[in-house]
Structures are given as C-alpha cells and as structure tokens.
Design a protein with these regions (language model features):
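C-terminal catalytic/acceptor-binding lobe
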Residues: 164-250
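Conserved donor-nucleotide/metal-binding helix-loop-beta segment in metal-dependent transferases, i.e.
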Residues: 94-124
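Conserved nucleotide-sugar donor-binding
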Residues: 80, 146-163
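Short beta-strand-to-loop acidic/aromatic patch adjacent to the donor-nucleotide binding site
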Residues: 81-93
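Short, high-confidence coil segments that cap the C-terminus of an alpha-helix
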Residues: 80, 111-114, 185
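Well-ordered, non-membrane alpha-helical segments in soluble/globular domains
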Residues: 20-24, 69, 97-106, 170-179
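Short, flexible, basic/aromatic active-site loop/helix in glycosyltransferases
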Residues: 128-143
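N-terminal anchoring/stem segment of glycosyltransferases
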Residues: 1-82
C-alpha cells in the first residue's frame, strides 16, 4: 500500500555524530508505521555501524553531486504523494503522529497547497487571522516564501524544485528559490498562543530543536539541547556555540 506521506531525512557523514540523537528521538516520538527514507553519502563504509533502524529505507547519493541532485536522486523511489523533509540535525522532541500527518495532507490536498512549514513566526501570525486546524490554538497561515525544513512538500513540487534548480544546501533558500516557491501555494502552521516563546518546539506536526547552525551548537536558542545530546553521549565540547541564530523564540 502506497503511504499518503513519508519522511525523508537528508544526511551527510560529516554530521554522523548527531545520528544517535536523531535516531533515538525518532524511535521515541515518531509512529513506528511511518515510512522513513534515510539518504546518506556513499563515502560511508558501513551504514550498519550507525544503528540506523532496519525498517528505514536507506538510499545513497554520490558525494560529487550538488545538493539538489543528491535529493532528486531518491524521488523515483518514494511513492507517497507528500514528503516530510528534514536534515539530520533537526531533532524531534515531541510526538510525530502518522494520523495527524495524514490529516494535514488531506487539508493540503483539499486546498491545493504545495508546501506546509511545520512552524511560523509572529511576523506572520500577527498579520493574519489564520485558518483553524481543528487542534486547539493551532492555525494555518499563508506564506509568501519558504524555509526548507521541517516541512511537508507535495512530492511533485519538491521534485520539480530539485530538477529545475541547481543548488547547494546553503543556496536552497536564496532569491531564485524564493521566487520559484512564490509561484506555489505555500502555508505554515503555528500555535498562536506560544508563537512568541515556542514556535519550533511546540510545532503541531514536528516538534523539534535545530541542533546546529553554521556548524555550531544551538545551545543559546535551546537551553535544554545540551542535556538532550549529552544523554546520547554526543561530544558537545569539540565545536563552538552559536550566539545569534534566531534567538527571538525557541
């Protein structure tokens, strides 16, 4: 049976040190019957060494490919109409429900939405009434741009993005990409009551902490992140701490 939505996790061996937390938190919070695709570079000698769950569908990409080509490589093997996409350092900290994700996909399909970001910002919520989700205090908001992840993409739109555009992972939100997405029907979802304090950690569809920004730990933004990583015996002392990345809310 073809799932309505699947999860695609893009990874790189350079950040494999974060995988224990990603896998542990996914095992803890994501419903077991969610289809998960794990995309990693072919320079890794033994993926089994990293204890990636057996039921995750594993794909490799060639290291010399640009980011959009790496991701585009896997679309033919994903059959779901919608894809929840994230990179390896966006760590879930709350329930990731298959039922809720499927209900959200139904809303997207009924309204011809192409993309739904898992959180928003008070600069958006302060200027719109929003559309009630059916879940207390959570509303959908129209967006005129995109933040790449974690977000639900219509499969065909995500594939078009990665086919038409030729981008590195540091360029996938540049002006050309923003212009492309402004021609699509893009939305966001947010808890209106907590948008000023907890917009990513209180996400309806993928509560999370973004562990790394520009290669530095996001301990300033997420004070509880270090304790979480320490619980997975991840070395948090070998790189610095980011001091300014989106500190207005968690």
């Amino acid at each position: 049976m073809i799932p309505k939505i699947s999860i695609l996790i893009y990874t790189h061996s350079e950040y494999s040190f974060i995988w224990p937390a990603l896998v542990g938190q996914m095992n803890k919070y994501a419903d077991e019957d969610l289809e998960v695709h794990f995309l990693y570079n072919d320079t890794i000698d033994d993926i089994n060494f990293h204890n990636i769950p057996e039921n995750w569908i594993k794909h490799t990409y060639q290291e010399d490919l640009i980011w959009t080509k790496r991701v585009n490589h896997v679309f033919s093997e994903i059959k779901s109409e919608y894809i929840l996409f994230l990179h390896e350092d966006w760590i879930p900290i709350g329930q990731v429900s298959k039922k809720l994700l499927e209900e959200t996909c139904d809303v997207m399909s009924d309204n011809s939405w192409d993309y739904l970001l898992s959180y928003s910002h008070f600069s958006v919520t302060d200027n719109q009434d929003g559309i009630f989700t059916g879940h207390e205090d959570y509303y959908f908001y129209k967006s005129d741009s995109h933040i790449f992840q974690p977000a639900i993409w219509k499969h065909s739109v995500f594939e078009e993005f990665c086919t038409v555009l030729n981008k590195t992972k540091h360029q996938n939100e540049d002006q050309e990409c923003l212009a492309f997405m402004r021609n699509k029907n893009t939305y966001e979802v947010q808890n209106l009551k907590t948008v000023r304090e907890y917009r990513t950690t209180n996400s309806l569809i993928f509560p999370h902490m973004h562990a790394l920004a520009e290669g530095l730990w996001n301990f300033t933004k997420y004070p509880s992140l270090k304790e979480l990583l320490d619980s997975y015996e991840i070395d948090t002392n070998s790189r610095g701490v980011h001091t300014w990345w989106e500190l207005d809310t968690q």
